[in-house]
Design a protein with these regions (language model features):
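Conserved AMP-binding/adenylation subdomain of ANL enzymes
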Residues: 188-205, 215-255, 264-278
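Conserved AMP-binding A3 loop
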Residues: 29-32, 165-189, 329
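AMP-dependent adenylate-forming
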Residues: 7-29
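ANL superfamily adenylate-forming
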Residues: 25, 109-161, 268-273
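Gly/Ser/Thr-rich phosphate-binding loop
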Residues: 245, 250-258, 264-335, 347
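AMP-binding/adenylate-forming catalytic core of the ANL superfamily
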Residues: 84, 90-94, 104-106, 249, ...
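Conserved pre-ATP/AMP-binding loop-to-beta segment of ANL
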Residues: 16-17, 129, 134, 149-169, ...
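Conserved AMP-binding/adenylate-forming
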Residues: 26, 41-86, 424
Length: 523
């Protein structure tokens, strides 16, 4: 099974009439899912989409997201899932123009930005809207018009394993986002290798609350569920949580995947005995695997979750460029603070700044090789070359350390590392300490220049509801618990930290805001 098309065909053959997707009151079987995919694929073919063309998806979680993705791939075309939180016309125009998208599957809420972007995208022919209420134009078309006679069953799979299946745009800290090219082989083998580590069976049920445009949700939940013919309970968003928590118990969800911020929120809510009982004896009553990814998970949250719900969190690691899973533990071999050993077909090594391999126990940049590693960046040959070492390993930009058993621990992002008087400070370590303060809900630290141009640490914190703390008290707390070079010299209390759709803190926005404040002060 080397392509996503083959994976889909097998899921329909093995799953048949079993429910593949639960979305609200709507249930779709594996056979019905494939049938609609074939129909939409034929509609796309009639609309002029061919092998190698790019078609974007700007859409919340829904069956139509999955249908669109596989229909695009069915023609040998390339799916381009885009973060639906990007709604500015200029940003959308850059991505749609960069990949040369011929069309976009979307929802009416996102039309203002897409209509604005369309004027700058000469290749864009149609915006197919999946929900009702949109005003149709020559450009804005109803999804239903693509429902054609099914794609001919006799048609050979136009894709081969080395073909690009998807382009995923990563949000860089500077400049424009880069399009990560993932092949059919990348995605299929990554899904299958991760499954071998997870010990799932066909009776398991998954929950998809993470956005499908992100590789964590797509490979870790959607492809996993299709590959094993698991029923997946899908929600359009993480918030509000109550509907999906109730559905977890009702549907018997056994695989739960979320980001650290969701786990932290659950730990906070579980402090009340009624909520803790609801979570432990209803929502999570059948959960056997709880996976965390996309950002570092603090030991405080991991401990709190295990104490409250009796489940150890299985923290995995990877990035968009690795499809995304590179490491994860078997459910019975989880180690606190570790993200597991590499999955089958993946190798990991630690290197220094000169790309020389470091011995076990040494901190350095994590490099990865194997079937999961991207083909490269779309239309960016120089960036692609720069992403790899001289001997062909992907440089991940993460700092980590391997132990003697091959387990990996993540220290931080290389770009987030702060150098204070020549000493390295990893923000994740400092933020973990700050999290121990009972008044603090969450925090983030960044490096800022002092009056002499040296880098010092500034902390941004959000207080818990009803908690009281001022700047001087927080600075004193830091002084008592941190070495001098790791200590924030300034702290700002915010109502909320800027985050993306995965609830990951956007430190670049904090840096940008700080620079603007300093520019204003300088003038």
């Amino acid at each position: 099974m080397s392509t996503l098309n083959a994976l889909l065909d097998r899921s329909a053959q093995e799953g048949g009439g079993k429910t593949a997707i639960v979305f609200g009151d709507r249930e779709t079987s594996f056979l019905a899912l494939r049938q609609e995919i074939l129909e939409i694929a034929e509609g796309l073919r009639r609309a002029g989409v061919a092998k190698g063309d790019r078609v974007a998806i700007v859409h919340r979680n829904a069956p139509e997201f999955i249908i669109a993705y596989f229909a695009i791939n069915r023609l040998g075309a390339i799916a381009v899932p885009i973060n639906f939180m990007v709604q500015k016309a200029d940003e959308l125009a850059y991505m749609l123009g960069d990949c040369g998208a011929k069309g976009v599957f979307t929802q009416k809420d996102f039309l203002p930005g897409l209509n604005g972007a369309a004027a700058k995208c000469p290749d864009l022919r149609a915006l197919w809207v999946t929900d009702a209420g949109a005003e149709h134009t020559a450009l804005v078309r109803p999804y239903s018009e693509l429902r054609a006679a099914a794609f001919p069953e006799s048609s050979a799979d136009p894709a081969v394993e080395g073909d690009v299946a998807a382009i995923l745009y990563t949000s860089g800290t500077t400049g424009f986002p880069k399009g990560v090219m993932l092949t059919h082989r990348n995605l299929v083998t990554n899904c299958e290798s991760a499954l071998k580590r997870m010990n799932l069976t066909r009776s398991d049920v998954t929950l998809c609350i993470l956005p499908m445009f992100h590789s964590f949700a797509w490979t870790g939940i959607v492809l996993t569920s299709l590959r094993l013919t698991l029923t997946s309970v899908v929600f359009s968003a993480i918030a509000p949580a109550k509907p999906w928590l109730k559905a977890m118990g009702r549907r018997g969800v056994s695989l739960f995947a979320a980001v650290p911020q969701v786990y932290a929120a659950l730990v906070r809510e579980a402090k009340g005995w009624k909520t803790r009982a609801f979570l432990r004896f209803w929502a999570f009553r059948r959960v056997k695997i709880a996976v965390s990814g996309a950002a570092p998970l603090s030991n405080v949250v991991a401990d709190g979750f295990q104490q409250a719900l009796g489940l150890a969190i299985d923290q995995g690691w990877g990035l968009t460029e690795t499809s995304p899973v590179a490491t994860i533990s078997a459910p019975d071999a989880i180690r606190l603070g570790m993200v597991g050993p590499p999955i089958e077909g993946v190798r990991v090594k630690i290197v220094d700044d000169l790309e020389a391999s470091l011995p076990i126990g040494s901190e350095g940049e994590i490099c990865v090789s194997g079937d999961c590693v991207m083909k490269g960046y779309w239309n960016r040959p120089e960036d692609t070359r720069a992403a790899f070492t001289a001997d062909g390993w992907l440089k991940t930009g993460d700092i980590g350390v391997l132990d003697e058993d091959g387990y990996l621990a993540i220290r931080d992002r290389k770009k987030d590392m702060i150098i204070v008087k020549g000493l390295k400070v990893f923000p994740a370590q400092v933020e973990a300490m700050i999290a121990e303060n009972p008044a603090i809900e969450e925090s983030a630290i960044i490096g800022v220049p002092d009056e002499l141009g040296d880098e010092v640490i500034k902390a941004f914190v959000v207080l818990k509801k009803g908690a009281v703390a001022d700047k001087s008290a927080l600075l004193q707390y830091f002084k008592e618990r941190l070495d001098a070079y790791k200590r924030p010299r300034d702290v700002e209390i915010l109502d909320a930290l800027p985050k993306n759709a995965l609830q990951k803190v956007l430190k670049r926005e904090l840096r940008d805001r700080e620079l603007k404040k300093r520019d204003v002060a300088g003038n």
